[in-house]
């Protein structure tokens, strides 16, 4: 048996209210690149399911930029580390790494000959640096600012010029190499932070945008101010991003006023204005004019493709998670995938396009801990002390069914739902609690097989109950585990029960007897166990970032290992078909794996 990666549903850009989001593209016009968590995401602009993730930063990433050749990416993080790595090989071989700043790197710019970089952000001694890419040696000084530098760019044509925008309201102009400060070209122009500066592709113009809603165009050779984009048509909120068209005549801007605009940089007039919703998450924090695709990123991290034919509605919105994905479920009848993340967001995925839709109505208010699918019902429970039974066809949340403490897991059989909180086991029918059983051993997980209900506890035991009508009656316990039970799952054939624990062990039970022994290949807590549709294999997911597939018919056989599946740990794993596995991880990604026997 072998397991190969098929597709990645990548996390969306990480966002912070009031701060720009950096999204950049490759020279070929195929892939975009952005930061999310401690990863860098490479994603095909036409097909979101085609993606790659760079995991090598030791902390939260902030920005990534392709070299003009397209052969390398330079990426930065909050600790001031700059990593330059190969894009042509799957392994992304590291070319160089430098400690450039003492604080977060916020923007990066390459010279068109691929030899030099300007790196800016926060720091104690300096807010920017100009370096040679292959040695890290200085090729100038980025000076003249008294506060954090938020943005930088380099003119693509010789003689090179560099520009920087800062929290001190200045746009500084540098000539070189070696780059040296010449002047503040925006003296008196901005009254708040300068969030983004960008040279036109031909280098003839520079556009700058600020938190004071203003935008200016300067001469790309001299830094002389040419025009202010029409104040009468300006955004009504701070501008966080700008990007040039390929024809050098138009610029796209993104604003906290929940709109994007296209401007004619010769006349200063607004040509198009794209409006979004009224929610705070509709604030636009970054944008990219990428070939024939106009992209904008909102506060929720969603990437919208703007539609020139309908300015009120994007032609496509790439949704996703930018927090850890804790639980997933697959609807075998419809072929849809469901996922929920740490921030309580719940998405339904179309696996043919990689696009997702939200449910409407009153959502959970805290992390969703479990998802199950029963026909048209989506059963969820969450840390907000509630269970919901929602309509899949209507894509609307159901009413909250309150429980006494954070809900840990749900399971169902027919019209019966069993949910466990940290204190109690609940039996739910028709959307109402019909019975509850106190549990002093803190339930953690639940599985149901017809009238047999198994509940895992922090006391290292599996408590087995018999369901009769609306009531649970204690039957027996299974106590071979030496750690708290973390997940339970009955086999589709109904003969076996799989369990995982915090002491890294997986056990398959046949009745009261353990069928498997010594399944302890994981090096950390088991987070999930799942059965293949034919009941022959069990997949386990762990905090150790590994997935193992165990052979139930041959328990002594070595399991198949999927190494380094997700950065920071695998939170859930499920089977789609016998030849397909879905996994969800701490980095916010969902991965689809092919399994071949």
From Swiss-Prot:
Subcellular location(s) of the protein: Cell projection, Phagocytic cup; Cell projection, Lamellipodium; Cytoplasm, Cell cortex
Family membership noted in the UniProt record: Belongs to the WD repeat AIP1 family.
Known outcome of mutating residue 125 to A: No effect on binding to cofilin or F-actin but does not restore impaired chemotaxis or F-actin assembly in cells lacking nhe1
Keyword list, A-Z: Actin-binding, Cell projection, Chemotaxis, Cytoplasm, Repeat, WD repeat
GO annotations of cellular component type: actomyosin; cell pole; cortical actin cytoskeleton; cortical cytoskeleton; intranuclear rod; lamellipodium; phagocytic cup
Effect of residue 167 to A: No effect on binding to cofilin or F-actin but does not restore impaired chemotaxis or F-actin assembly in cells lacking nhe1
Main localization of the protein described in the UniProt heading: other
Phenotype when the gene is knocked out: Impairment of growth, macropinocytosis, phagocytosis and movement. Prolonged cytokinesis with exaggerated cortical protrusions and production of multinucleate cells.
Further facts: Suppresses the impaired F-actin assembly and defective chemotaxis characteristic of cells lacking the sodium/hydrogen exchanger nhe1.
SMART domains associated with the record: WD40
Keyword hit for Repeat: yes
Any coiled-coil regions, as ranges: none
GO MF entry, a single one: actin filament binding
Name recorded for this polypeptide: Actin-interacting protein 1
CDD domains reported in the protein's UniProt record: WD40
Binding partners and assembly: Interacts with cofilin and F-actin.
Functional note: Implicated in both actin filament depolymerization and polymerization. May enhance chemotaxis by promoting cofilin-dependent actin assembly at cell leading edges.
